[in-house]
């Protein structure tokens, strides 16, 4: 039986390159183009190794790796971070959650490096290396523009994560792609339990109807900026506020804000 590999990257051509390399080595390759698709793939299949970029749409790389760790209670199979911004992450490899780290580079050199790497992990039992290091195709150095991009992304994620209100980011198919720690505390669930789950699953039947009405309303009528209602979540009355997310004049999802109701509300 062929071993299965999951490749997750938003770059279609890189996914095809890596898929062809792995197929030639006898692997069955599953593909995903964002972190949310990667989670969905793991719900339907089991894999023997995973390659993922760090900068991913919807659910980013570190969040994706964290999800896998929680879902499989530790070290289920080799998790390989393969990214063009790996060198810029040298100071925070422990925070990424992968077992191995490979920097993207020229395809001809990267092909050699990947074949050497795969041969190595095929010939010995999987045991996560104690020392975290980046495999690179040559002399590479951090780039200022990449560092600035990472800092901006991390800042915006920190704003969401540290907000006093619960914030849930919902994709256009109504599935959850992010929930900050306040939201997780309010609903009494872990991140692994809510990522890629329908947001309606958080609410009981009567309040689910309010949620669905709000989702539809703010999507269809752009002049309506928010829709609010009260819900009982984890035995507490929670003020729930829904607004739509627009990107380049296109609807891409919703923000659901959760705030425990005050006594005089």
Give the role of each language-model region.
Residues 15, 56-57:
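The feature encodes the CheY-like receiver
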């Amino acid at each position: 039986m062929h071993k299965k590999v999951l490749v997750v990257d938003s770059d279609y051509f890189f996914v095809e390159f890596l898929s062809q390399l792995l197929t030639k080595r006898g692997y069955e390759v599953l593909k995903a183009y964002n972190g949310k698709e990667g989670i969905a793939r793991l719900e339907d299949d089991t894999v023997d190794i995973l390659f993922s970029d760090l900068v991913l749409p919807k659910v980013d790389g570190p969040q994706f790796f964290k999800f896998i760790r929680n879902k499989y209670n530790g070290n289920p199979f080799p998790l390989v971070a393969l990214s063009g911004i790996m060198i810029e992450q040298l100071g925070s490899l422990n925070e990424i959650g992968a077992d191995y780290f490979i920097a993207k580079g020229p395809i001809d050199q990267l092909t050699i490096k990947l074949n050497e790497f795969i041969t190595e992990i095929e010939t010995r039992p999987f045991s996560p290396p104690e020392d975290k290091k980046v495999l690179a195709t040559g002399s590479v150095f951090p780039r200022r523009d990449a560092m600035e991009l990472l800092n901006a992304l991390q800042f915006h994620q920190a704003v969401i994560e540290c907000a006093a209100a619960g914030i849930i980011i919902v994709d256009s198919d109504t599935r959850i792609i992010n929930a900050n720690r306040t939201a997780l505390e309010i609903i009494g669930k872990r991140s692994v339990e809510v990522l890629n789950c329908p947001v309606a699953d958080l609410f009981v039947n009567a309040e689910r109807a309010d949620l669905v009405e709000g989702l539809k309303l703010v999507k269809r009528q752009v002049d309506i900026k928010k829709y609010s209602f009260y819900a009982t979540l984890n035995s507490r009355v929670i003020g729930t506020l829904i607004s739509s997310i627009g990107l380049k004049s296109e609807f891409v999802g919703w923000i659901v804000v959760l705030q425990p109701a005050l006594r005089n509300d």
